[in-house]
From Swiss-Prot:
GO molecular function per UniProt: calcium-activated cation channel activity
UniProt GO cellular component terms: membrane
Annotated localization: Membrane
UniProt keyword annotations, A-Z: Calcium, Ion channel, Ion transport, Membrane, Transmembrane, Transmembrane helix, Transport
Family membership: Belongs to the CSC1 (TC 1.A.17) family.
Annotated transmembrane regions: 2-22, 89-109, 146-166, 351-371, 403-423, 443-463, 488-510, 553-573, 595-615, 620-640
InterPro entries: Csc1-like, CSC1/OSCA1-like_7TM, CSC1/OSCA1-like_cyt, Csc1/OSCA1-like_N
Function: Acts as an osmosensitive calcium-permeable cation channel.
Membrane topology of the entry: Multi-pass membrane protein
Pfam short name (any one): RSN1_TM
Protein's name in the database: Hyperosmolality-gated Ca2+ permeable channel 2.4
Lineage: superkingdom: Eukaryota
Primary localization: membrane
Amino acid sequence: MLLSALLMSVGINSCLCVLLFILYSVLRKQPRNYEVFLPRRLANGTYKRRRNKVARYIPSLKWIWKSWRPTEKELMESSGLDGVVFMRMITFSLKVFLFAGIIGVFVLLPVNCFGDQLTVIDYADWSANSLDLFSVANLKVRSQWLWVHFGAIYLVTVFVCCLLYFEFRYIALKRIEHFYSSKPKPEQFTILVRNIPSSDGSSVSDTVDRFFGENHSSTYFSHVVIHRTSKLRSVVDKAKKLYKEVKHKKPVKKTPMRFFSRKDNTEGHYESVLQEMEQNIRLGQAEVSAPGKEVRAAFVSFKSRYGAATALHMPQSINPTYWLTEPAPEPHDVHWPFFSASFMQKWLAKILVVFACLLLTILFLVPVVLVQGLTNLPALEFMFPFLSLILSMKVVSQIITGYLPSLILQTSLKVVPPTMEFLSSIQGHICHSDIQKSACNKVIWFTIWNVFFATVFSGSAFYKLSVILDPKQIPLKLAVAVPAQASFFIAYVVTTGWTDTLTELFRVVPFMVSYIKRSFEPSDENEFVVPPMRYHRDTPRVLFFGLLGITYFFLAPLILPFILLYFILAYIIYRNQFMNVYAPKFDTGGMFWPMIHYTMIFSLVLMQAIAIGLFALKKMELATYLLVPLPVFTLLFNEFCRKRFMPIFTDYPAEVLTKRDKEDRNDPTMPEFYNNLVSAYKDPALLPLRFSGSGSRNDSLTSPLLSFSEV
């Protein structure tokens, strides 16, 4: 790719970013758009409507300053530890690429430019130069300047590992601090017990009560048996949906003509429909709750956190297949459809998910091959000779080779996060947070494989096959293929990174949906949705740009300023979104950080493998041998971090649990907490529904037709 094509891509995306910034600064101040750009502040009642109509139409950047103001403590209080972990991931990346950027731009880039392996740089016409002239490919074989790159690789590796250690330790301590500062929660006192053995003449509830009463007599408190309620839940969801429609349906004004016309009995019709649904739901609840209809699983609660932890980690039976225990999620985080599926259905679902992921990976190679075809202008002219005249136009060729490939790849990637979330939901996870973590992990490795490896090895299928059949050649193959795609990934960072981050700020899809809904029906100011943060979509994106920056920092240092600008935009925009848009739906307690840590370690090892292959190709034998221990030390460092910090992420230490239990003895709210703990894990589909059929006619029309408890 020529420098002119990159400049064209940068120019187009810079204009889009400025346009989105201006539009956001104006549209966010319009009252009708508050539900799109400020739903969380509306829900909290912390946003005042503007009285100055003129100021609403003047672009302002005050929101940027406001997004910098909240401290980390305030962010944790409002968005939980997951929000803090996400922002720490971005600040970690900023530190890494500020350090790598200084080395890359001020040291490595000048060294690459003054090489003469390819051709002499045309200083008179910078835009006509190839981007390869700014990469390590411009250095000759056995060039002594390659030792500068060798030193840079060691420096960045040590710097990143030190940062990873301090960040892992910081998040682990924050996890303990968050546990100390939080109020007592049901999941801290509860475990999930599965594979409860059948007992003649006893129900599942009696079996659980007798077993834990005998074996955990000093700590056992209560239990809730789980039922299969998938069919019943669909009926309840329909009733709730109808209730919302009736609740927000505006009453029809009576006119003289309507007074003499046939009576409009819409309210009575809906009330009768809801009453019929209520009756069906009650019958369904009675049927599901009948003896013998239970799932052989239960949520078992204890009087203390230490008692729950002891029961969780201790084998409960001589037969290891019975009384299996695992941590209980938050009550509102439970994925209830998981319990309605049989063992065979779960087993088949896991196999189906594996095949679906493989199929999606294969299908995604189509846009990758298309993208690579667009970046090769001579190949396009050869395959489509009738386009030669159009492709000969400089502006058209720059747009096709510099902007269009990244745009196609960006659009294709939009379907991956929701698809992976759906696949994870049928895989057999007991809570929504586990579904998000599983989807996040799938999206990370899907992106790395299909966007990175499939792109760099897209020359031919036989080329990929030769890499698989001869693993020893992987570093050499990477050293050849990865630098060749440097120009594409620079354009990818500009197109996907910058523009995607700005579209996250502008919330294009919710804005369009809101505009269309207002066009067809009047909007209710009190009816809006506060969305949760979609970590499975945004975390892989940030991590992938981190992988690109680490991999290319010594190969093509020109990518580093664009990566750094992306993380600056991400820092400002995501802080703004946490303040104004997203509200936490659940909190994993920082469990996304190990995933982030392992991905960064993979990025380092990948960079080191490419460096070993590159120095081998450049005939730098001594440098190659000196680099071989580097990935070994990196993996040993990762193992040290895993042994040192991961136990805190899997279980809380005994001293932490006992300290909190002692503090609870002096807490006057604990009796009320224990009363609520008894029913905290009751299935929402089994909660009672009530219609307001009593009272006068006017009361029945003005009061809610259906009331229900929310969990």
